[in-house]
Amino acid sequence: MPTTRCSGPFLVVAPLSLIAQWQSEIALWSPDINCVVMHGSQQARDIILSYEFYYHEAFTPKADVQALRKKNACKFDVLLTTYEICMKDIKLFTKIDWKVLIVDEAHRLKNHQARLFEVMKTIPRQQCVLLTGTPLQNKTEELWALLHFADPTKFKNQHEFVSQFGDLRDATDVAKLHSVLKPYLLRRVKEDVEKTLPPKEEVIVEVRNFIQFSHFAGHFYYCNIE
């Protein structure tokens, strides 16, 4: 997979709460990249589709436009969107051959029988990157779902994967699973990201008057819910 000067289009699917952060980081680290956010009402998305997706003769020579349209070339380099919009406009996203599909908070794909998984699996892509802090939450079936999404050819049989790694009875089983994951998993640890952070320090504070504390904690919780 090329690491530099790789042209798009790239599709980033993330929760709505992270879209602004993605947009900010792209602007900071790659200001020359044309990044478009696909979100909002149907009318707003139609406008984005009309003016931001493909080249038009009003802004580009006619001959160039015709050539670009034959290639189905996109105006943007990166398209940011949410899970919800991706599901609503899936017919649009499946018409584009994406260079890379990036899925943030990818643990939402842990259920391979869910509609979200089935819909997003139809998106054409040459490469796939899944970002998650919890690739394995409860069951090895969830890990298989992510691996199947990333490489459905190699990880096509859930039963076979679970029968081999489902129990993880001893260190040997864990080592085998690690060897399978190694080509697919890039783990980020604190030491690699920020070397100036001090060592973790835990402080245990004894809380007295627990009944009174519980009353205030419950009141604070319900106030936030409301």
Question: What are the functions of these language-model segments?
Answer:
Residues 1-170, 178-203, 208-226:
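ASCE P-loop NTPase motor core, strongest for the SF2 helicase catalytic module
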